[in-house]
Amino acid sequence: MLLIPETHELVLENVEALIPEAQGRFDELSSALNKDDINTIVENMLDDETDLAVALASINENMPLNEFIVKHVSARGEITRTKDRKTRERNAFQTTGLSKAKRRQIARKATKTKIANPAGQSRAQRKRKKALKRRKALGLS
């Protein structure tokens, strides 16, 4: 596991963009070094190239990036295990409002309803029915 600098914010998209480069470096390193040596190199890279180091470590550990857990050290020296922001967002408990999925579902339903009953046609139909009832009441049809 890695100890990333406290000042660095880990963004999954940035790390994913570096995976091809990390894979190339890993292929070169794995031909000459074992897993522990590669971990040592990754730890030394953390200060300069944090995102690349995380990508390389996830490849070395054979884990998907979004599951790769990172230890975070606070200024007081407390070590906590945190996942990247996207994973935390996905796993977070919904406290208020509607979930994104529910919002999307409602939007899809609204779109279907709009297509099925366009406002102009619905209004015209109401007026037509009202006129027919009025004509019937007056005995014209």
Curated annotation (Swiss-Prot):
Plays a role in the phage head size determination. About ten copies of gp68* are found in the mature phage head. It comes from the Viruses. Residues 100-112, 124-141 have a biased composition (Basic residues). This is Prohead assembly protein gp68. Residues 80-141 are annotated as: Disordered. Residues 80-91 have a biased composition (Basic and acidic residues). Keywords: Virion. One of its GO terms (cellular component) is virion component. The record marks 16-17 as: Cleavage.
